[in-house]
Amino acid sequence: MSKGRIYEFDPILYPRLLWIVKGSGEFVREHFRKKGGEELTEDDVDMRYVDAWVCKCERKSDNRLGIVFFFDTGLEAKQLVHECYHALTAFVSEINADLPDYDSDGMEEFAAYLIEWIFDCCWKVKQGKVK
């Protein structure tokens, strides 16, 4: 069994968890599979060419659904924000919603709050402020 750590966050209002994973791709594959039951492949979690990875997954231990956010702790803030957007779109697609336009009379606020929450979770893990 490979070494790693899973940080779990529950957005409460949304029916999916956010798992931020530190460790190897092998560690991710030991604990998660793709949503729908398909196993993650080595290519899915290959970090040689990317600094972060986001995927809709199931936790193998209990089949809970969520978003896995796997990143190198050396990730810069601008890259982290980029990946947070991918996590946001994964959450939004899981509730069968669309991202609203800016000119939608404030209807985009839910997405702004959700991406803020995702970034805050990631930033706390990156800064070592989560136990």
List each model region and its residues.
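Charge-rich, low-complexity N-terminal segments
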Residues: 1-35
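Post-HEXXH active-site segment of zinc metalloproteases
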Residues: 67-68, 73-78, 87-128
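Intrinsically disordered, low-complexity regions enriched in Ser/Pro/Gly/Gln/His and often acidic
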Residues: 10-12, 46, 110, 116
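Active-site scaffold of zinc-dependent metalloenzymes
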Residues: 29-75, 90-91
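Walker B catalytic acidic pair
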Residues: 83
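Short intrinsically disordered terminal tails
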Residues: 1-3, 127-131
